[in-house]
């Protein structure tokens, strides 16, 4: 019994010594990453306005059980007569970063959840085609029994803030990062004015979003590492059509006002 008590005491003492060192190491890593983040001031007003428009002013495209064998280029899929509720659009052209990805979904029943753009969009009905990058998942065998709410951990200047569970939801077992990111940035723009200029109440200057799945998969974006001034280039980050398992999935967001 005496040996057992000594062992417990040693384990307790060891945990006291080791734990602070681990925390400090993690804090050092986070501080380095924080310094590497891009600043809002690096972006033009046009870029910020278009990011705001893409994520907050427009609704994402949502389609279920769609199929097409049509293509414009080898790395695209063309869905003719896709839209029934948008007056200005008729066809949908989805771009991928490889022809292999397009072939994988060609003539398959799929669900789509991408953010659209129309400037410099070519391939379908002239002036009546919306373009996207990725946002595609299989329709068969990928549905949850009920919609799942994805928890968000939010830190602003290192202080954790409470976020309600209704901000990001999905009905898929495997979901594209784009579907999650579209909802998360919509929340950040509407509630925290993420892409507003300073004069319009945009206090956030730098930020990072991470999507962390139970299988160890992780995808992260620098929220102000924005390519170009227009959605045609800004949304290209989704052309890889990355997906994550929704089992034990959560989102971590780090925002800084300086």
UniProtKB/Swiss-Prot annotation:
Family matches, as InterPro entries: Enterotoxin, Staph/Strept_toxin_CS, Staph_tox_OB, SuperAg_toxin_C, Superantigen_bac, Toxin_b-grasp_Staph/Strep, Toxin_bac
MF (Gene Ontology): metal ion binding; toxin activity
Effect in UniProt of substituting residue 252 to A: Complete loss of host cytokine gene expression
Cofactor binding, per record: A zinc-binding site contributes directly to formation of the homodimer.
Protein keywords: Enterotoxin, Metal-binding, Secreted, Signal, Superantigen, Toxin, Virulence, Zinc
GO cellular component: extracellular region
Signal peptide location: 1-25
Named cofactor requirement(s): Zn(2+)
Impact reported for residue 212 to A: Complete loss of host cytokine gene expression
Effect seen on changing residue 114 to A: In strain: ATCC 23235
Binding sites annotated in the UniProt record for Zn(2+): 212, 248, 250, 252
Record bears the keyword Metal-binding: yes
Localization: Secreted
Superkingdom classification of source: Bacteria
Pfam families: Stap_Strp_tox_C, Stap_Strp_toxin
Oligomer and partners: Homodimer; zinc-dependent. Interacts with MHC class II molecules composed of alpha/HLA-DRA and beta/HLA-DRB1 chains.
Family: Belongs to the staphylococcal/streptococcal toxin family.
Protein's job: Staphylococcal enterotoxin that activates the host immune system by binding as unprocessed molecules to major histocompatibility (MHC) complex class II and T-cell receptor (TCR) molecules. In turn, this ternary complex activates a large number of T-lymphocytes initiating a systemic release of pro-inflammatory cytokines. In addition, induces B-cell proliferation and differentiation in the presence of T-cells. Causes also the intoxication staphylococcal food poisoning syndrome.
Name of the protein this chain belongs to: Enterotoxin type D
Protein source organism: Staphylococcus aureus
């Amino acid at each position: 019994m005496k040996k057992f008590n000594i062992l417990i005491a040693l384990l307790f003492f060891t945990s006291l010594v080791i734990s602070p060192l681990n925390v400090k190491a993690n804090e050092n890593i986070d501080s380095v990453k924080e310094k590497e983040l891009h600043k809002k001031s690096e972006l033009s007003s046009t870029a910020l306005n278009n990011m705001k428009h893409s994520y907050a002013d427009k609704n994402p495209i949502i389609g279920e059980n769609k199929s097409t064998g049509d293509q414009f280029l080898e790395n695209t899929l063309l869905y003719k007569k896709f839209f029934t509720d948008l007056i200005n659009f008729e066809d949908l052209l989805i771009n991928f970063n490889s022809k292999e990805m397009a072939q994988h979904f060609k003539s398959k029943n799929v669900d789509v959840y991408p953010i659209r753009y129309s400037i410099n969009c070519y391939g379908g009905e002239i002036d009546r085609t919306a373009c996207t990058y990725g946002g595609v998942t299989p329709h068969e065998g990928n549905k949850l029994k009920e919609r799942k709410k994805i928890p968000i951990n939010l830190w602003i200047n290192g202080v954790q803030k409470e976020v309600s569970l209704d901000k990001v939801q999905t009905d898929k077992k495997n979901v594209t990062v784009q579907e999650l990111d579209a909802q998360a940035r919509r929340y950040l723009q509407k509630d925290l004015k993420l892409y507003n200029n300073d004069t319009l109440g945009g206090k956030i200057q730098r930020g990072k979003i991470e999507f962390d799945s139970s299988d160890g998969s992780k995808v992260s974006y620098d929220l102000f590492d924005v390519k170009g001034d227009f959605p045609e280039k800004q949304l290209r980050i989704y052309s890889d059509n990355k997906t994550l398992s929704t089992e034990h999935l959560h989102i971590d967001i780090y925002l800084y006002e300086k």
